[in-house]
Amino acid sequence: MIQQETRLKVADNSGAREILTIKVLGGSGRKFANIGDVIVASVKQATPGGAVKKGDVVKAVIVRTKSGARRPDGSYIKFDDNAAVIIRDDKTPRGTRIFGPVARELREGGYMKIVSLAPEVL
């Protein structure tokens, strides 16, 4: 579960390394986000020469969480870190590569470009 002020690792090569959650999108009183949800975030650490700079406000989709997600068959998927991919308004990633595994739940959310770029889909 990701909430306001949560710091996430960035799993793409957009230039950001770490982001801080500002808001969870999808309803006025929404507190928590899980895999496949969109957040508004601020870039806290960035690599030099990247597409995004420190202090930029970006949208990101969550691809991995430590708390995990429950699947319809009753199983759970959990990861070692909390990670997100920075996206544009049309749900395409800002970067050209995705690092680490991503959850299958992104496929139902319409993030096919992220799923196709990911090295592993769990």
UniProtKB/Swiss-Prot annotation:
Disulfide bonds, paired cysteine numbers: none
Keywords: Ribonucleoprotein, Ribosomal protein, RNA-binding, rRNA-binding
Record's keyword annotation contains Lipid metabolism: no
Pfam families: Ribosomal_L14
MF GO annotations: large ribosomal subunit rRNA binding; structural constituent of ribosome
Gene Ontology cellular-component terms listed: cytosolic large ribosomal subunit
SUPFAM superfamilies: Ribosomal protein L14
CDD domains listed in its UniProt record: Ribosomal_uL14
Superkingdom classification of source: Bacteria
InterPro entries: Ribosomal_uL14 (IPR000218), Ribosomal_uL14_bac-type (IPR005745), Ribosomal_uL14_CS (IPR019972), Ribosomal_uL14_sf (IPR036853)
GO biological process: translation
Function of the molecule: Binds to 23S rRNA. Forms part of two intersubunit bridges in the 70S ribosome.
HAMAP family (alphabetical): Ribosomal_uL14
Subunit structure: Part of the 50S ribosomal subunit. Forms a cluster with proteins L3 and L19. In the 70S ribosome, L14 and L19 interact and together make contacts with the 16S rRNA in bridges B5 and B8.
Protein family per UniProt: Belongs to the universal ribosomal protein uL14 family.
Protein name: Large ribosomal subunit protein uL14
Natural source organism: Streptococcus equi subsp. zooepidemicus (strain MGCS10565)
Gene: rplN
